[in-house]
Amino acid sequence: TSETIEGPYEWQGALIYSGFDKDTIAGTDVLDYVDEEYALKNYVRNNGYNFEEYPNAIDPSVFYDADDRMWMVYGSWSGGIYLLELDPATGQVIHPEADEEHNVDAYYGKKLLGGGHKSIEAPYILYDETTGYYYLYVSYGTLTSSGGYQVRVFRSKTVDGDYVDMNGEYPTADVDHQLYGLKLTGNYKLPSLERAYMATGHNSAFIDEDGKQYLVYHTRFNNGTENHSPRVHQMLMNEDGWPCELPYQTQGETVSDTGYETDAVVGRYFVINQGTNISNDIANPVILYLNADGTVVGREAEGTWEAVD
């Protein structure tokens, strides 16, 4: 901890442990919160850590809920994404009472989603008082340029879940997780971009003082290297209360508060369908025309559109 953000910081101790076995568990604080029989039965498997069911204690993100309670969401692959409350006076963990029915472990906290060593990591929770939802952002895939790294989002009306996607579902240990979660960004290319964005992930998000909402993440490119670059993109909320990432890094753009005339919307659009796959495939745009008569025309799709107040 430190009295100032610039530091210096003083070591106060560990918050949570993972990766131990039956011989090293005594060097952790696990047995301060659960009995040894429970710990060895559940947290240890085949003389090693039970990474299929319990979390990897990395990728922490600390936030405050709508009632100013302090929380830490964490986890990477392994047993999934977990949530623990923190004491705002000390930053130390407030370990909950076990509640197996609601996926609450006395040491690791509330399991939110994932498990089975599925590629879900880098959780970040942001509360939006306008929509009344907590948004849980996670990354799927691996962070190399060929790893299909991408950002998904789930939401909940309560800080401890359930966090669900646009279909009202969430991934558990025994499902194909790529089918779950609203995909915000992955590998994609637009005509004005010199290189495709690759492995876009491990994000945070924030709402600025002017109410604009942003996604912050790192990306690689299809340039034959693993060099990466941070990016900040504005997000807009659709009418169903889901964030939609704008395709270009922010340049201070502002969306009109009063909307747009129909004539301003008519025209040619480059449309990207990112799908739900986790791969090194690059989503390339197709061209669609929004016509003044309300029709949508293109080689890949057709339909209708309308402007609403």
Identify the residue ranges that each predicted region occupies:
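Carbohydrate-active catalytic/glycan-binding domains of CAZyme proteins
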Residues: T1-D309
